[in-house]
C-alpha cells in the first residue's frame, strides 16, 4: 500500500482499530469459557491477532499499545483520565483503550489510554 492515498490508509486504519477492539473483547471473554472450549478459542484469537498484524504490515501500518509504560507528552496517545491523575507526566499507562496507528513517518490515529491512579473508564 505504499502508493495509496492517506484517505485509503485512514480507512484501513479505522477498520483495523475496530478489529483490534473486537479482538480485545473476545480475549476478555475467553476467561468465561469452560476449559474444554478455551484452548480452541484462544488459538483462534492468536491466529486472528497475527493475521491483523500481518495485514497491517502489508499496508505499512502498525498498531501501538502502551500498557505499563511511563506516560510522556511525546507518545501518540491521549489520556482519557488526565484530569483525575495528580501529575499525568509521572503516571504509568494502565491500559490502552485504543491503540495508536502509525504508518511510515505519519500518525494515522492518536491512541487513547487510561493512566494508573485515575477514575476507571468503561471499555465497552
Regions found by a protein language model. Name each.
Residues 1-36, 47-50, 54-124:
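Extended, amphipathic alpha-helical stalk segments that mediate dimerization
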Residues 42-46:
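Short, charged, amphipathic alpha-helical segments
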Amino acid at each position: 500500500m505504499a502508493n495509496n492515498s492517506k484517505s485509503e490508509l485512514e480507512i484501513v486504519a479505522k477498520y483495523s482499530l475496530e478489529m483490534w477492539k473486537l479482538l480485545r473483547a473476545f480475549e476478555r471473554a475467553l476467561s468465561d469459557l469452560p476449559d474444554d472450549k478455551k484452548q480452541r478459542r484462544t488459538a483462534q484469537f492468536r491466529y486472528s491477532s497475527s493475521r491483523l498484524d500481518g495485514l497491517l504490515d502489508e499496508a505499512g501500518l502498525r498498531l501501538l499499545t502502551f500498557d505499563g509504560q511511563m506516560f510522556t507528552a511525546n507518545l501518540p496517545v491521549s489520556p482519557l483520565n488526565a484530569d483525575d491523575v495528580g501529575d499525568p507526566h509521572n503516571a504509568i499507562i494502565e491500559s490502552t483503550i485504543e491503540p495508536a496507528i502509525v504508518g511510515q513517518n505519519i500518525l494515522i490515529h492518536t491512541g487513547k489510554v487510561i493512566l494508573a491512579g485515575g477514575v476507571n473508564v468503561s471499555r465497552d
